[in-house]
């Protein structure tokens, strides 16, 4: 009984407007940021290095290099602060978690683009 009620509530909060993406894809995430009374939209563009699946609590981690410093940010997929997600490039990878990309620099950190 309890699980059915939770499923109904969680299914109402699912988002269907986001595109399909997987680990290894380059994406741009537009995030709504509220600072005091002001609200703005900030873009975070980078490589998806991990997707963690747990029903409606799905999260994904995006990594980018900013001023030669690696920055990682984890987003809940069904979060209302995410305005949109745009897939910029699909890459060919053979792993679901790309944590080894943290140690790579320069040309060794490149991934092959998936051919259509």
Curated annotation (Swiss-Prot):
| Entry's Gene Ontology cellular component terms | cytosolic large ribosomal subunit
* Ribosomal protein keyword on record: yes
Keyword Disulfide bond among record annotations: no
UniProt GO BP:
translation
The record's InterPro entries line, in alphabetical order, gives: Ribosomal_bL19, Ribosomal_bL19_CS, Ribosomal_bL19_sf, Translation_prot_SH3-like_sf
Spell out the molecular function terms from Gene Ontology: structural constituent of ribosome
Keywords, A to Z? Answer: Ribonucleoprotein, Ribosomal protein
Question: What Pfam families is this protein classified in?
Answer: Ribosomal_L19
Query: Which regions span the lipid bilayer?
Result: none
What function does the entry list? Answer: This protein is located at the 30S-50S ribosomal subunit interface and may play a role in the structure and function of the aminoacyl-tRNA binding site.
Q: Which family does it belong to?
A: Belongs to the bacterial ribosomal protein bL19 family.
Q: What is this protein called?
A: Large ribosomal subunit protein bL19
Q: Which organism does this sequence originate in?
A: Mycoplasma mobile (strain ATCC 43663 / 163K / NCTC 11711) (Mesomycoplasma mobile)
